[in-house]
Each structure stands twice: as structure tokens, then as C-alpha cells.
Amino acid sequence: MKNTYYITTPIYYVNDVPHIGHAYTSVASDVIARFIRLCGFDVMFLTGTDEHGQKVEKAAINKNIDPQKFTDHTSESFRHLMNVMNISNDDFIRTTESRHKEAVAIFWQKLLDNGTIYEGFYEGWYAVRDEAFFDESELTSDGLAPTGAPVEWVKEPSYFFNLSKWQDKLLEFYEANPDFIRPISRRNEVISFVKSGLKDLSVSRTTFNWGIKVPNNEKHVIYVWLDALASYISALGYPDKQSNYGKFWPADLHVVGKDILRFHAVYWPAFLMAAEIPLPKTIMAHGWWTNEGQKISKSLGNTIDPIKLIDEFGVDQVRYFLMREVTFGADGNFARSNLVTRINSELSNKIGNLLQRTTAFVYKNNDGKVPLLMQGIIDKIYELPILKTASKFAEQNILLMEKTEINKVLENIINLSEEANIYIDSEAPWNLKKTDPEKMSEVLYTLLEVLRYIAIMLQPFIPSSANKMLDQLGVNKEERLFKHLIRDYALRAGSSILEPAIIFPRFEGDVV
């Protein structure tokens, strides 16, 4: 059985500072990476920055700085975002690194040697903002790219990749691998695009300089998307099969925004087929965010700075909201009031309140120790409906994550916490101390065990807070994987818990 897993974010374009979309993609990828690690897999999680191209060159010129200095600064802002958002990436690739440039040159030469690249002359529409070529038929009635980006007519010598040759092979691959593109709506869009006819793709430019030079013809720079996509293999050490490339490729999951799906689901597999490299297993395209129902744009002044959000609300609170608020793959709306509601109603009232009530009662009434139980009682507890629900959700969540139904995993966890809050109210352990102390011990143990399940399942989403919960419950650091969510690793009777501390404070600031 394969015990490795390779997941990537897109490498982010450095023409501007990070925004909420970058944060969302990074957190979603991080949640999946952490989840897979907790399943016992050896995970490689890659993120990084895409630093070449005409758009970056223009941005640097506009600021009157050298492109390398410009990209150094902007790339660092993305690295800072990863640190602040507690992203657990194993590597951070920059396309200006020598390891990447060397791999791209080898990749280009392989395509050339295989007869899939040829010289010609390009004449057509190009959107600098998208770093993409568009056919006349794809332009809007206003003469813009489908994304709304302005286009310009480009005429220049160019190398071409024979994309048209791969049309049928791509369609055959999509048919044979229905999970290659998710969600299904995006898969259908890609298939429709490919069926409409693929034209050979210009893969070099001569009208600007900021990029990787074409080997043996330095008048040309390699098309930024061929350059960028190759980062997924260059970061692993391509073409050395004794490196991580041999260990982790093909990728298990590329997480991308829907706006760059064509590059990943059409161009990338075609390049790989042409270079005789195995294709990634799945490309997951998520939606866009709006701000209070409005499209986010600089001109409207409604961009969302994820760093400021974290400063105000806390990193785990923002991570939780991003993953809970929207079905992964669909568009989402950022509303401050919804963020506050998620924090106060779910994290604080449901999970935090359950943790606080239970641990405070145990600490005060049971000397801060997991209750001692009569022989066989733990087996009996595991037959209770609430523990059966916990076990069921633990199994369900693995299946849900395999389908990248991230918010449904959180929904299960919240439902379990709601059931536990109902349980504590109905059993009222505070009334049992004098009348039935053995029953009180059973109730408290049950609640602590449910909290163990909740905390272990929350680790991918809110790692810092979840681990504080596990510390508070006295769970060994070596027993926090998903395989430990069984009766054999139940809390040890008589073990100590930490003095209760508030992990999920309510947000008392402005709601709007």
C-alpha cells in the first residue's frame, strides 16, 4: 500500500500581496495535509511563489525596482502568511531558485527532444493580468478576457507546444479517470473546453525579459505557465528518481482556484504526457470569495487582508471560519457577522463551553483526575449512543475528506458537540455527586472521552487550539492520530487533566 501523499497549493503569483483567496487555498490544503498525516501517511506539502512573467516585470518597473528585489520582497510576504496562518508546508518553492530553473531547462529539453515543441510566429490576443492567451471567440462583448482582464494583440516569434495533438488523449484520460477533476461541474467545463478544439500553445515570449531563458536561444523566455507548473516536479528534485521526485510523484492532489483550472487540467497533463511523466491523481478547483455579497476588487476598496483578520480574531478562529463557512469547491461569501457567529455560537458556546463545563467539574469534584471506573464500565460506555456517534463520525470523516468535503467534517464535529451538550444537561452530573457517585463518574468519563474524539478530529482545522484541548485532557502526544480513536486508547482512569483554561473565548468586538 502506498504510504506517501503529495499535495500542492498553486504557487502564488507575486505581482501583489496575499489576500483572502490565497489564505483560503493555503488553509484548505493545510487541513488536507494535516488530516492525511494523522492517517499515518508520509506527506509532502508544497507551496511557493510564481515569480516570472510580463505582469511581474511591469509591476517591478512601475515601482522602479529590480524584478529580483521586487519578487524577493513579495515572496517573503507569502512566506509570512504561511507562518502566521500556521500552514504546515514541507517546502516553499520559488521559480527564481536555481533548482527550479535547472529542472525547467531539463523539462523543456525533454519536450523538445520528443518533438512536441517547434518554432513559429504567434499572433493573437494576450491578457497580461492572466498571463494567458485567448482565442477571438473567447473574448467578451466588451473585448475582454473571460476573467474581465484587458487583452492586447501580440505579434512575435514564438516556440509552440503541439497541444492540438493531445486533445483526444486528454479526453480519453478524463473518461478513464473521473476523479481527475473535482468538483464534477468543473470537470464538465474542462471537457467541454477540450472538445471545442485545442490549438497549439505559444510557450515562449520575446517581448520582455523577466523569465527563464529558452535553452540555446536566449532571445526567448519560457512561457510563465510552463515555467510555473513545472514547480510541482522541480521542488521534488526532477528528474532525479532517487530524490523526493521518485518518492512522491505523481501528486495526489493539486488544490487550485477555479480561475486557473485550465492551466492545471488541460495544459499541465498535456505537458506531462508529452514528457512521458505520470499525471497527478486529482485536481481540486475551489470557488471565489465575495465580501458582504460584493465582488472583491482593489477598485472597490473591499479586499480582505488575512493578516489583519487574524490579528483581530485569532488564527484558529479564521481557519475555522474559512473551512466551515462554504462547501469546498463552491463560491463563498465573507461576512463579518457570520465570522463572529461561527466563533461565538460554535467554537465558544458549543465546543468551548462543553470543554469548560466538563473539565472544571472534574477538576473541582474529582481532584483533577479522569474518574476511576468499575471493571467493564468503559466497555459499557462505548455502547452508549453518544460514543457510537463519536466512533461513527470518526470513520465518516475519513471518507468525507477523501472526497474533499471539508466543511461536512466540521459539521459532524459540531453535531457531536451539540449531542454532548445535551447529554451533560440531561445527565446533570452535579446532581449525582451525593446521590450516585458511580454514575457521576461514568457521565464525566463519557464526556471526557467525547472531548478526546472532538479534539483529535479538530487537529487539522485548528491545530493550536485542538492540541491545547488534548493537553488539557491529558492525552499523550504519541496518541493523537486517527488510529487512536478507538476504545483501546480511551483515557486512562486516574490520569491527571490540566487545570481548565479558556481556549475558545467569545468575540466581544464589533459584529459589523
Swiss-Prot record:
A motif ('KMSKS' region) lies at residues 295-299. One of its GO terms (molecular function) is ATP binding. Gene3D superfamilies: 2.170.220.10, HUPs, Isoleucyl-tRNA Synthetase, Domain 1. NCBIfam families: metG (TIGR00398), PRK12267.1 (NF008900). GO terms for biological process: methionyl-tRNA aminoacylation. It is found in: Cytoplasm. It comes from the Bacteria. Keywords: Aminoacyl-tRNA synthetase, ATP-binding, Cytoplasm, Ligase, Nucleotide-binding, Protein biosynthesis. It catalyses: tRNA(Met) + L-methionine + ATP = L-methionyl-tRNA(Met) + AMP + diphosphate. ATP binds at K298. Monomer. Its EC number is 6.1.1.10. Belongs to the class-I aminoacyl-tRNA synthetase family. MetG type 2B subfamily. The keyword Transcription regulation does not apply. This is Methionine--tRNA ligase. It comes from Rickettsia felis (strain ATCC VR-1525 / URRWXCal2) (Rickettsia azadi). A motif ('HIGH' region) lies at residues 12-22. CDD domains: Anticodon_Ia_Met, MetRS_core. Pfam families: Anticodon_3, tRNA-synt_1g. One of its GO terms (cellular component) is cytoplasm. Is required not only for elongation of protein synthesis but also for the initiation of all mRNA translation through initiator tRNA(fMet) aminoacylation.
